[in-house]
Regions:
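Short, positively charged patches
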Residues: 1-123
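Glycine-biased, small-residue-rich flexible motifs in mid-sequence functional cores and linkers
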Residues: 67-200
């Protein structure tokens, strides 16, 4: 495949994803380093069918697709060289607010750790009421950060290691649904993607 970095270079060189696909046969003349394997990857009928299936899922489930060019795309993430070209989102939140706190921690949180997490999130809600909490949806500190944010009525977003056609772990589904009104679920992965270790 082309990957995030390769796709970003193509779009930077040509102008947009639409232009890259529209002018794919001309790419070797327009951009140094583009070879036939890239054109083959861009010309893959199976990839087009997969993209159509994904868009049907997006529309049916009222998801938001954020591309690197979208103003709503998380600006801090956009600065990373390997930022995903497309993000899929379900929920309601501004990713580009002034205060964003990413919280991660052990999956085997102690009672002290859980209480510290809850107290920290509560203090944030008092000091920075517009704060956005971002974490995974895993056991331990991840899920406790989201639950603390919900309890203190502050925005919280879970970054998922799989597509939006599933929730993993399933026991966190209620919390995930509760987050949709003031935060939501974000992923770079297509549907039918399982939460493999390399995705975390």
């Amino acid at each position: 495949g082309i990957g995030h970095i390769g796709a970003k270079r193509l779009m930077d060189g040509i102008g947009s994803a639409v232009d890259v696909f529209g002018r794919r046969k001309e790419l070797p003349e327009l951009l140094p380093g583009v070879n036939s394997s890239i054109i083959t990857a861009l010309d893959c009928p199976a990839a087009f069918l997969r993209a159509e299936r994904e868009m049907e899922f997006v529309e049916k489930n009222r998801l938001t697709c954020l591309t690197l060019q979208d103003e709503a795309y998380p600006s801090r993430l956009r600065e990373c060289e390997d930022a995903p070209i497309v993000l899929f989102f379900k929920g309601n939140v501004d990713f580009n607010r002034l205060h964003v706190i990413n919280m991660v921690g052990t999956r085997r949180a102690t009672e002290y750790g859980k209480q510290f997490c809850a107290d920290f999130v509560h203090d944030l809600s008092v000091l920075l009421p517009d704060v956005l909490i971002v974490s995974g949806l895993a056991y331990g500190i991840d899920i406790h950060a989201h639950r603390a944010a919900l309890a203190d009525n502050i925005s919280t977003v879970a970054v998922l290691a799989h597509g939006l056609d599933r929730i993993y772990p399933f026991v966190h589904r209620k919390t995930a649904v509760d987050m949709l009104a003031n935060g939501g679920l974000l992923t770079e992965f297509l549907t039918e993607t399982n939460p493999g270790k390399h995705n975390f």
